[in-house]
Amino acid sequence: VKALYEKMQQLPNGEQQKVGELKLEKQIEVLFEGVDKDVFKPLDNSSLDLVDDIKEDFAFLHVGLWGKGGYGEDRKDIAKLIKLFYEAFANKKEQPGLILKSNSATFSILDREECLRKINNIKNMFPKDWNLPNVYLLHGSLSPKEMNKLYNHPKIKCFVSLAHGEGFGR
């Protein structure tokens, strides 16, 4: 046995009682997903046409697949992220932008329209007279070098995620 882990329980009289054990008989290795440091690295001057036209100087970035399902049903929780973003920055004098690098399933025009419809549905949850911050959809495939430019863009100040239920399911 390479390792033995015992689960102990505190009894009312103060004594400890063993309630289970885990024996690890074979060493395991965990290989975390890596990063290609030749591609993903700091850049001195980063420009990406898709982001350059965004008017805000401060933007949040979210990157993730917008899964199927209704509000609160996708693992990335993009709908809730947008709703919370609107709530936090509605009617503020200076508003940041939110850039969503996302798609639902494909990079098709129909998929893009579906993502825009979802954003609009969330926007419609708020009173019409509210001044809501801008949410930008960056839809489509980007190369690793373009993604690095996106991550390093001077307007992007913060990466945000409400993801839950993540795993290694490939």
Feature names for model-found ranges:
Residues L24-Q27, E94, K155:
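Short loop/turn motifs at secondary-structure junctions
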Residues K37-K149, H153:
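Conserved catalytic-core segment of nucleotide-activated headgroup transferases in glycan assembly
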